[in-house]
């Protein structure tokens, strides 16, 4: 049994107490965004009520308190991912921003004939920046494909060559739910002198992250997918690499000195944080990290595995329902994409909503993967710390009711 008590955890999330379409809300769209515990909401309000001031600028009391809280949150994030230094922890708007920043760095170093290796399962945020970087530099974008609903490691290893300059992969697929062995892949990348980039949007909220152990060169995460506010995230980069990177945005507070014709930059991490940052979001993300750390990331991962072990076989047993990704629950994170024969995923999601069950339907910002699977879209249920086995049962019951309803109307 897991050390987590989901029923106790749910008490911290007032939003989950509501009724939707005369049914208790079952929120299973956590891969899109997570709900926020009361302590995160309180932290946001406390900043605006008590400490609202700009950071790194003023010497008055409010400014000093805001700056201290902002930088304390950076230290919490450093510990959360086990970076060596807060110099390696850059606040961003989210994973998309972080990957775009890495893409801009790639434009500095890529040359014609170089290659960037990604996988077919990537989120658009880990595809388009590389497409653009390759277009601008004459480099080539190379895809690794799937085997049995997972990354084909043999194919990936064959694609990583002396031409490879970047390897960029999601640690957990936001559609297939498979967990990619990024530590092993980082070794392959470094053997040929390539940079290893990890999209941690779907992994950082759900498992312990140690960027030093992974030996990745970059790692990105989004606060809103791990109980924090929207509009805040982190890009981790090894200090020696970040020192090589040009600033992405220019303006206030990222400068050391501005002359009439040129300027010099501050040291890390501030040379990448131009303008007034999302101060409240960063501080509240620190509160979210405190909340998750108190539960224990190992406990969170183990509990979510219990839910997957419980619900995945039930879904696989439903006649006419196809689950995408690994068949073995132990290889499947808490993201389950599926389709029902003869039904459009949007109709399925709408019908489930009538039963109070919130899931997502669409291409999940992964159109190359969806095309590769030979489908146009899929429904997706995704789980988190406040979900229960009763939520799993409700999902299965709602799917069966949906099938029965549409079978009666077709």
Model feature map: region roles:
Residues 1-410:
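Pyridoxal 5′-phosphate
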């Amino acid at each position: 049994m897991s050390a987590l008590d989901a029923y106790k955890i749910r008490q911290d999330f007032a939003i989950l107490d509501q009724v939707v379409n005369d049914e208790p809300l079952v929120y299973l769209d956590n891969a899109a965004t997570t709900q926020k515990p009361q302590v995160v909401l309180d932290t946001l309000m406390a900043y605006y009520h008590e400490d609202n001031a700009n950071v790194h600028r003023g010497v008055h009391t409010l400014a000093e308190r805001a700056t201290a809280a902002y930088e304390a949150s950076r230290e919490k994030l450093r510990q959360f991912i086990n970076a060596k230094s807060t110099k390696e922890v850059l606040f961003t708007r989210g994973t998309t921003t972080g990957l775009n920043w890495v893409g801009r760095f790639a434009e500095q170093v890529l040359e014609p004939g170089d290659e960037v290796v990604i996988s077919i399962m990537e989120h658009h945020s880990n595809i388009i920046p590389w497409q653009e970087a390759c277009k601008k530099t004459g480099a080539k974008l190379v895809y690794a494909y799937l085997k049995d609903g997972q990354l084909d490691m043999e194919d990936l290893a064959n694609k990583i060559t002396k031409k490879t300059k970047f390897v960029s992969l999601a640690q957990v697929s936001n559609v297939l739910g498979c967990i990619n062995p990024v530590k092993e892949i980082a070794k392959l990348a470094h053997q040929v002198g390539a940079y290893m980039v990890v999209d941690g949007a779907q992994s950082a909220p759900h498992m312990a992250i140690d960027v030093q152990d992974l030996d990745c060169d970059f790692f990105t995460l989004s606060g809103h997918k791990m109980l924090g506010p929207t509009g805040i995230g982190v890009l981790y980069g090894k200090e020696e690499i970040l020192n090589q990177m040009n600033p992405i945005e220019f303006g206030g507070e990222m400068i050391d000195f501005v002359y009439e014709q040129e300027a010099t930059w501050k040291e890390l991490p501030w040379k990448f944080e131009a303008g007034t940052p999302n101060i409240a979001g960063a501080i509240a993300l620190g509160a979210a990290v405190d909340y998750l750390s108190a539960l224990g990331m190992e406990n969170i991962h183990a509990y979510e595995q219990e839910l997957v072990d419980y619900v995945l076989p039930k879904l696989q047993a439903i006649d006419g329902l196809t689950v995408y990704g690994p068949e073995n629950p132990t290889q499947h994170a808490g993201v389950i994409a599926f389709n029902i024969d003869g039904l459009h995923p949007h109709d399925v999601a709408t019908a489930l909503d009538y039963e109070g069950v919130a899931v997502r339907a669409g291409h999940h910002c992964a159109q190359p993967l969806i095309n590769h699977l030979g489908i146009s879209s899929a429904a997706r249920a995704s789980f988190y710390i406040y979900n229960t086995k009763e939520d799993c049962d409700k999902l299965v019951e709602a799917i069966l009711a949906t099938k029965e309803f549409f079978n009666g109307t077709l």
